Amino acid sequence: MRLNKFISHNSKYSRREADKLIEAGEVTINKVKIENFGYEVKEGDLVSIRGLHVKEKTELTMIVFNKPKGTLVTQKDDRGRTTIFHKLPGKFRHFIPIGRLDFASEGLLLLTDSPKVADVMMKSGLDRTYNIKIDKPLTAEMEEAMKEGLFLDDARAGGHEKSKIYSMEFAPFVYYEVRGVSENFTKLRVTLTEGKNRELRRFFGHFDANVLDLKRVEFGGIQLNNLPTGKNRYFTRREYDDIHKYLKMVRQAEAQEQKEEEDRVRAERLREKKKNQTEDQARRAESAEKKRLREIKQKNSNRNNPNKKNKKF
């Protein structure tokens, strides 16, 4: 982990404040002054600020935040727009959002102080449930795509105008339910296992339908329930237990995958070794056979020309 990031995740200082401390020469690693913001902190490194040791946090903290519409999921915005960190208490300014909700979307957003957990959760196939409202009636084509999945060579409809994402593959929805219908709109609850860039807006945009409202209400079993807009709460004990169980499963799966890869490499090396041994044995056998044939030929030649080997020049 980069030094400034390490400091922001394990102390009261923000990343910008960490940069200033490093620049001022107030940060040491193993008692040596460090002025490189990008220094990669290694396991066993002793990081200190003004002589005080910065201890790496081992305890996990998770919060649920009800993101309001009109806020960005980012630390800062060059255009001065409101971010979620303008709404969160300052003690959470170093927390990492797990996934994204776009500017016009609202609802459940998980944040953590653990980069490793954030990475695992963002890559997970955990269910994400949304309440959405589109400006069209639901069609048979939409339902078929929700059930079967969809690949679009051109998925720009519904995407941000500056997005560089062109094509997109949509996995089948885990679940969908129609919750309201009128001539001009349809309300749905849908569950996905992905969190791709403006995924639902692009999906329905393909069918010329605009998503008017989008609210995430659940992620991996963590529910928004009645948490007010713009407010946050810590995980409950049950939620912490569930996340620790999930992380344990991920670690076990990774360990099993690593073992299988090591076994595969070992088996491949063994096959290669046996192949080389077989080829070497074949070469030696061929060489021995050639030698035997030469000796036979030489003997036959000597019999046919008994005086040849005594020939004098």
Language model features with spans:
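A basic, amphipathic helix-loop patch mediating RNA/tRNA/ribosome contacts
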Residues: 1-45, 206
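RNA pseudouridine synthases
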Residues: 26, 39-251
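Intrinsically disordered, Lys/Arg-rich low-complexity segments
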Residues: 255-313
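Intrinsic structural disorder
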Residues: 1, 7, 243-249, 293-296
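Bulky hydrophobic/aromatic packing residues
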Residues: 3, 63, 128-130, 187, ...
